[in-house]
Protein backbone atom coordinates (compact mmCIF):
# COMPACT_ATOMS: atom_id res chain seq x y z
CA UNK A 1 0.00 0.00 0.00
CA UNK A 2 1.25 3.44 -0.93
CA UNK A 3 2.11 5.70 2.00
CA UNK A 4 0.23 8.99 2.03
CA UNK A 5 1.52 12.27 3.34
CA UNK A 6 -0.74 13.48 6.12
CA UNK A 7 -1.01 17.22 6.61
CA UNK A 8 -1.61 18.34 10.19
CA UNK A 9 -3.88 21.33 10.75
CA UNK A 10 -1.96 23.72 13.08
CA UNK A 11 -5.02 23.90 15.32
CA UNK A 12 -4.26 20.30 16.42
CA UNK A 13 -1.06 21.44 18.14
CA UNK A 14 -2.63 24.70 19.35
CA UNK A 15 -5.45 22.85 21.13
CA UNK A 16 -2.95 20.36 22.58
CA UNK A 17 -0.95 23.23 24.06
CA UNK A 18 -4.13 24.59 25.66
CA UNK A 19 -4.88 21.17 27.14
CA UNK A 20 -1.35 20.98 28.58
CA UNK A 21 -1.67 24.43 30.14
CA UNK A 22 -4.76 23.37 32.08
CA UNK A 23 -7.29 25.37 30.14
CA UNK A 24 -10.78 23.97 30.38
CA UNK A 25 -10.12 21.42 27.63
CA UNK A 26 -10.07 17.80 28.78
CA UNK A 27 -10.12 15.96 25.47
CA UNK A 28 -9.41 16.65 21.82
CA UNK A 29 -10.92 14.57 19.03
CA UNK A 30 -8.89 14.48 15.83
CA UNK A 31 -10.29 13.26 12.53
CA UNK A 32 -9.00 12.74 9.00
CA UNK A 33 -10.81 14.49 6.17
CA UNK A 34 -12.60 12.48 3.47
CA UNK A 35 -9.43 12.29 1.34
CA UNK A 36 -7.44 10.97 4.33
CA UNK A 37 -4.72 13.57 3.82
CA UNK A 38 -5.55 16.21 6.47
CA UNK A 39 -5.83 15.68 10.22
CA UNK A 40 -7.94 18.31 11.97
CA UNK A 41 -9.64 19.01 15.30
CA UNK A 42 -13.17 17.68 15.11
CA UNK A 43 -14.11 18.87 18.61
CA UNK A 44 -12.81 19.57 22.08
CA UNK A 45 -14.58 18.70 25.30
CA UNK A 46 -14.37 20.39 28.67
CA UNK A 47 -14.56 18.49 31.92
CA UNK A 48 -17.30 15.92 31.52
CA UNK A 49 -18.17 12.63 33.14
CA UNK A 50 -16.54 9.38 32.07
CA UNK A 51 -19.89 8.21 30.66
CA UNK A 52 -20.31 11.38 28.60
CA UNK A 53 -16.75 11.03 27.29
CA UNK A 54 -17.41 7.44 26.18
CA UNK A 55 -20.70 8.44 24.57
CA UNK A 56 -18.93 11.12 22.54
CA UNK A 57 -16.76 8.52 20.80
CA UNK A 58 -18.30 7.34 17.51
CA UNK A 59 -18.73 3.58 17.77
CA UNK A 60 -18.19 2.91 14.06
CA UNK A 61 -15.61 5.53 13.03
CA UNK A 62 -11.95 5.91 13.95
CA UNK A 63 -10.60 8.90 15.83
CA UNK A 64 -7.38 10.03 17.40
CA UNK A 65 -8.16 11.31 20.88
CA UNK A 66 -5.99 13.22 23.30
CA UNK A 67 -7.32 12.86 26.83
CA UNK A 68 -6.09 14.57 29.97
CA UNK A 69 -6.63 12.55 33.10
CA UNK A 70 -6.73 15.17 35.84
CA UNK A 71 -6.58 12.66 38.72
CA UNK A 72 -2.92 11.93 37.91
CA UNK A 73 -2.23 14.76 35.44
CA UNK A 74 -1.38 12.33 32.60
CA UNK A 75 -2.03 13.05 28.95
CA UNK A 76 -3.12 9.96 27.05
CA UNK A 77 -3.08 9.56 23.27
CA UNK A 78 -5.79 7.16 22.15
CA UNK A 79 -5.91 5.64 18.69
CA UNK A 80 -9.54 4.54 18.46
CA UNK A 81 -10.00 2.09 15.58
CA UNK A 82 -13.23 0.06 15.84
CA UNK A 83 -13.08 -3.56 14.65
CA UNK A 84 -15.36 -2.81 11.68
CA UNK A 85 -13.02 -0.24 10.09
CA UNK A 86 -11.49 -1.19 6.74
CA UNK A 87 -7.77 -1.90 6.64
CA UNK A 88 -7.05 1.06 4.34
CA UNK A 89 -8.72 3.47 6.77
CA UNK A 90 -6.90 1.91 9.72
CA UNK A 91 -3.63 2.35 7.82
CA UNK A 92 -4.40 6.03 7.20
CA UNK A 93 -5.09 6.61 10.89
CA UNK A 94 -1.88 4.79 11.77
CA UNK A 95 0.04 7.19 9.51
CA UNK A 96 -1.80 10.15 11.03
CA UNK A 97 -0.89 8.92 14.54
CA UNK A 98 2.77 8.80 13.63
CA UNK A 99 2.65 12.27 12.07
CA UNK A 100 0.86 14.01 14.95
CA UNK A 101 2.86 12.30 17.69
CA UNK A 102 6.04 13.82 16.24
CA UNK A 103 4.55 17.26 16.99
CA UNK A 104 3.05 16.65 20.43
CA UNK A 105 5.53 16.95 23.28
CA UNK A 106 4.13 15.77 26.59
CA UNK A 107 2.14 12.62 25.83
CA UNK A 108 2.49 10.28 28.84
CA UNK A 109 0.70 7.21 27.56
CA UNK A 110 -0.34 5.71 24.22
CA UNK A 111 -3.29 3.37 23.76
CA UNK A 112 -4.52 1.49 20.70
CA UNK A 113 -8.18 0.75 21.31
CA UNK A 114 -10.62 -1.37 19.32
CA UNK A 115 -13.31 -1.80 21.98
CA UNK A 116 -14.80 0.93 24.18
CA UNK A 117 -14.59 -1.39 27.19
CA UNK A 118 -10.83 -0.77 27.10
CA UNK A 119 -11.53 2.90 27.90
CA UNK A 120 -13.93 2.32 30.77
CA UNK A 121 -11.15 2.58 33.37
CA UNK A 122 -9.49 5.78 32.21
UniProtKB/Swiss-Prot annotation:
Its main location: cytoplasm. It comes from the Eukaryota. The gene is cofF. The keyword Cell inner membrane does not apply. Residues 3-122 form the ADF-H domain. The lineage of its organism: Eukaryota, Amoebozoa, Evosea, Eumycetozoa, Dictyostelia. Controls actin polymerization and depolymerization. Disulfide bonds: none annotated. GO terms for molecular function: actin filament binding. GO terms for cellular component: actin cytoskeleton; cytoplasm. Belongs to the actin-binding proteins ADF family. It is found in: Cytoplasm, Cytoskeleton. Keywords: Actin-binding, Cytoplasm, Cytoskeleton. The keyword Cytoplasm applies. It comes from Dictyostelium discoideum. This is Cofilin-5. PROSITE patterns: ADF_H. GO terms for biological process: actin filament depolymerization; actin filament severing.
